[in-house]
Swiss-Prot record:
The record marks 61 as: Reversibly protonated during proton transport. Pfam families: ATP-synt_C. PROSITE patterns: ATPASE_C. It comes from Atropa belladonna. InterPro entries: ATP_synth_csu_bac/chlpt, ATP_synth_F0_csu, ATP_synth_F0_csu_DDCD_BS, ATP_synth_F0_csu_sf, ATPase_proteolipid_c-like_dom, F/V-ATP_Csub_sf. Its main location: plastid. This is ATP synthase subunit c, chloroplastic. F(1)F(0) ATP synthase produces ATP from ADP in the presence of a proton or sodium gradient. F-type ATPases consist of two structural domains, F(1) containing the extramembraneous catalytic core and F(0) containing the membrane proton channel, linked together by a central stalk and a peripheral stalk. During catalysis, ATP synthesis in the catalytic domain of F(1) is coupled via a rotary mechanism of the central stalk subunits to proton translocation. Key component of the F(0) channel; it plays a direct role in translocation across the membrane. A homomeric c-ring of between 10-14 subunits forms the central stalk rotor element with the F(1) delta and epsilon subunits. F-type ATPases have 2 components, F(1) - the catalytic core - and F(0) - the membrane proton channel. F(1) has five subunits: alpha(3), beta(3), gamma(1), delta(1), epsilon(1). F(0) has four main subunits: a(1), b(1), b'(1) and c(10-14). The alpha and beta chains form an alternating ring which encloses part of the gamma chain. F(1) is attached to F(0) by a central stalk formed by the gamma and epsilon chains, while a peripheral stalk is formed by the delta, b and b' chains. The gene is atpH. The lineage of its organism: Eukaryota, Viridiplantae, Streptophyta, Embryophyta, Tracheophyta. Belongs to the ATPase C chain family. The chain crosses the membrane at residues 3-23, 57-77.
Amino acid sequence: MNPLVFAASVIAAGLAVGLASIGPGVGQGTAAGQAVEGIARQPEAEGKIRGTLLLSLAFMEALTIYGLVVALALLFANPFV
């Protein structure tokens, strides 16, 4: 294997995981903060807000998992070799 291709694949894998986690991380923090604020304003709607929050967090976390899958594909099933 060409060492330059291997080094580029490792750097790309790191960038894939890093960049794929920035957006969902910010989004999850914002969503959780807004959910806490909403529960503080309307405590009787806690169940509905919590359910919606958990579903939203799962969808946001899926984006990070896609970045991890791309990184693992670059590291272990490298198409550039």
